[in-house]
Swiss-Prot record:
Xref: CDD domains: Histidinol_dh
Cofactors that this protein relies on: Zn(2+)
Recorded family membership: Belongs to the histidinol dehydrogenase family.
Gene Ontology cellular component list: cytoplasm
Name assigned to this protein: Histidinol dehydrogenase
PANTHER family registered for this protein in UniProt: HISTIDINE BIOSYNTHESIS TRIFUNCTIONAL PROTEIN, HISTIDINOL DEHYDROGENASE HDH
Keywords: Amino-acid biosynthesis, Histidine biosynthesis, Metal-binding, NAD, Oxidoreductase, Zinc
Pathway: Amino-acid biosynthesis; L-histidine biosynthesis; L-histidine from 5-phospho-alpha-D-ribose 1-diphosphate: step 9/9
NCBIfam families: hisD
Pfam family, one: Histidinol_dh
The record's free-text note on cofactor binding: Binds 1 zinc ion per subunit.
């Protein structure tokens, strides 16, 4: 029996080699779909009619909140001047991105969370892929795409969608791929990295809650169970100083750690490096400085993960599987490329070139040394 890596590699290579013919075969095999891949203008119009007016208002207000939060992250230049010389960074948006929207449960919020910071960054071209169900794309996903000005939506799922975006099969290839998926999608993203950029390899959802005796036990339990709803591989931890709360939340799927004090709770949280960390204590702000590893920190009883997932305006694309030790939340800057900018004055060049000349000598780079020495 083939392992996941080999199985995905063979599909990717087949699509890269045979192009559309192979892509259509896999679409029929996995999605039972044999029609045109690109969503037509008529399908966008039909989808808009299918979304109730009340839901349209919910989506639009949610998107406004997301836009307000993410717009504050934008920056296009960071410069400083020293001795007449100019140094800094300029930021340029990625030219073309692909967004994978999972199809198991339609996730219009995924498209909002990725599409809005992309637009704020100035990304010019966005292609969306999502698995069709009965030959159609979820109308809520199409409505969000329309609001974002995205005209390219493709009925493609799984490894085939990643191959299409990375190799330019049935569409122009993208520069970077965003969006969560199952283990096949994750493995495909891992294998095409280097040909294109990727955001991250999203795993099962996670929540850790630090809570003390002041926490409402029903709030805490509801929050822990909310993340287990994502699937059987989801993880939930309760880190608490309260024996009563520990006993109340001891349910299947929840790992309870009874700690001596809140400092130990914070220490355990850093070891877990959870995707979401709620702190529901009498003074939650006092623990923030102790937290080093978490995708997001939500303070107090009225900042549950589902609120962040849907309406707070913060981004819910977060590192999982302990990746919060070395990566963080999706931001506008993930859609931009920092480029070094420098213009050095003659005065500063002549004052400091001796440093470069000596380093070039140490490294045996004579032509480098000469490039510095020749200037007068």
């Amino acid at each position: 029996m083939k392992g996941l890596e080999e199985y995905v590699r063979e599909i990717l290579e087949d699509i890269r080699r045979r192009g559309l013919e192979a892509l259509r075969e896999y679409s029929e095999r996995f999605d039972n779909y044999s029609g045109p891949f690109r969503v037509s203008e008529g399908e966008f119009e039909e989808a808009e009619e299918l979304v109730p007016e009340e839901d349209k208002r919910v989506i639009e207000e949610t998107m406004e909140r997301l836009w307000e939060y993410h717009a504050r992250q934008f920056r296009d230049v960071e410069l400083y001047i020293k001795r007449g010389s100019l140094y800094g960074l300029i930021y340029r948006p990625i030219g073309r991105i692909g967004i994978y929207v999972p199809g198991g449960k339609p996730l219009p919020s995924t498209l909002m969370m990725v599409g809005i910071p992309a637009r704020i960054a100035g990304v010019r071209e966005i292609a969306v892929t999502t698995p069709p169900k009965d030959g159609k794309v979820n109308p809520y996903v199409l409505y969000v795409a329309k609001l974002l000005g995205i005209e390219e939506v493709y009925k493609l799922g799984g490894v085939g969608a990643i191959a299409a975006m990375a190799y330019g099969v049935g569409m122009r290839r993208v520069d970077k791929i965003f969006g969560p998926g199952n283990r096949f999608v994750n493995e495909a993203k891992r294998q095409v990295f280097g040909i294109v950029g990727i955001d991250s390899l999203a795993g099962p959802s996670e929540i850790a809650v630090i809570a003390d005796e002041s926490a409402d036990k029903d709030y805490v339990l509801a929050d822990l169970l909310s993340q287990l709803e994502h699937g059987k591989d989801s993880k939930a931890w309760l880190l608490t100083t309260s024996r009563e709360l520990a006993d109340y939340c001891s349910r299947e799927g929840i790992e309870v750690l009874l700690c001596r004090n809140l400092e130990e709770c914070a220490e355990k949280a850093n070891e877990i490096a959870p995707e979401h960390l709620e702190i529901i204590t009498e003074n939650p702000e006092e623990l923030v400085d102790l937290i080093e590893n978490a995708g997001a920190i939500y303070l107090g009883p009225y900042t549950p993960v589902p609120a962040a997932d849907y309406f707070l305006g913060v981004n819910h694309v977060l590192p999982t599987g302990g990746a919060a030790r070395f990566s963080g939340v999706l931001t506008v800057m993930d859609f931009m490329k920092p480029i070094t900018l420098a213009r050095v004055s003659r005065e500063e060049f002549l004052a400091y070139r001796r440093l470069g000349m000596r380093l070039a000598e140490i490294e045996g780079m004579e032509a480098h040394r000469r490039s510095l020495e020749v200037r007068r």
